Structures are given as C-alpha cells and as structure tokens.
Amino acid sequence: MSHAQEHEQPAGPALPQTRTARHRRIVDILNRQAVRSQSQLAKLLADDGLTVTQATLSRDLDELNAVKIRNTDGDLIYAVPSEGGFRTPRAPLGESAKEERMRRLSAELLISAEASANLVVLRTPPGAAQFLASAIDQAELHDILGTIAGDDTLMLISREPTGGQALADHLLRLAQNGG
C-alpha cells in the first residue's frame, strides 16, 4: 500500500461520500451519543473520514429534521425524532419509564388537543411533533391505534370509534399534571 493510500480512508469499513451515506452516519452518531454542537458533530464525522463544511452540515441537519432537545442532564443535544430520537445513555425503559417519558414530553411540548370521533389532533411547538409522536408510539398505549406527525401537528387514531375525546382528555391531563 502506498503512503497516499494509507491516508485516503480511515480505519474500518470504507464509507461512501454520498449525501445518503452522510445522513445515515449523522443519524447513527446522534443515536449513539449526546452531540451538543455542529462543530462537535463535524469533528465526529471527520474522525470517520467524512469531511463536511458547516453549511453542508447545517443543511443535512435541516433535511433530517434534527431538533435540539434537553437531555436528562439538562444539556441541549441534537436528536432526529423520525429515527427514534433521544437515544442517550439511561436505564432501559420499562413500561412505566416509557409512560413517564411520554408524560414528561407531553408536559413540555403539548399545546392543545382536540378530538373528533376516533381522531385526536395535537399541537406542539414547531419541530416537536415527531418527537412527541415517537414518545407516544414507544409508550405502546392500547387505546392508540397509531400516530401521524408533521412539523407541529400530530394526529392520533383511537382504537375505539368514539374514543377520541377520552384520549384527548387523557393527554391533556398528562400535560397538566405530568412534567
């Protein structure tokens, strides 16, 4: 191997220099460790052989819908809600811990809840809907058939044909009493 070849790739598997590969690597890093800044993320990517400019990294985070959230230590860190977000070191989540996480996030993020038949529409601050939807999904509540999230709006589907209002009331109680 020539001297030039030794410096072309980092140790480990070769990573393609495509946008998709870079996005996948960013998500992997954010799911594995707490990243507080774009410069920290750029260094972690560079350690893996992916050199990016701050502008590219900013655009990548925007395309991934990454958000900054407060972790259990109170630090603001990046998370990608659509990829399961918030994977920081903590005790394994049992049923009560998953529900507690949903309760805490409801208290922090839920602005309003309105029901119609078996549907509930939840409003959150911009960028937070997918994060709250992920917490609701992980809590695996029997009454919820599924969630759909946009930027600041979630739609929950109640398992019962007329269960939307009871579900909305339950989530509003969590938001008021939980955090």
Swiss-Prot record:
This protein's record includes keyword Aminoacyl-tRNA synthetase: no
- Region (Disordered): which ranges? 1-20
Task: Classify the source by domain of life.
Answer: Bacteria
Any Pfam family from its record, for instance, is Arg_repressor
| Pathway this chain belongs to | Amino-acid biosynthesis; L-arginine biosynthesis [regulation]
The protein's matches in PANTHER family, at most eight in alphabetical order, are given as: ARGININE REPRESSOR
Family to which this protein belongs:
Belongs to the ArgR family.
Instruction: State the protein's name.
Output: Arginine repressor
Organism from which the protein derives: Streptomyces coelicolor (strain ATCC BAA-471 / A3(2) / M145)
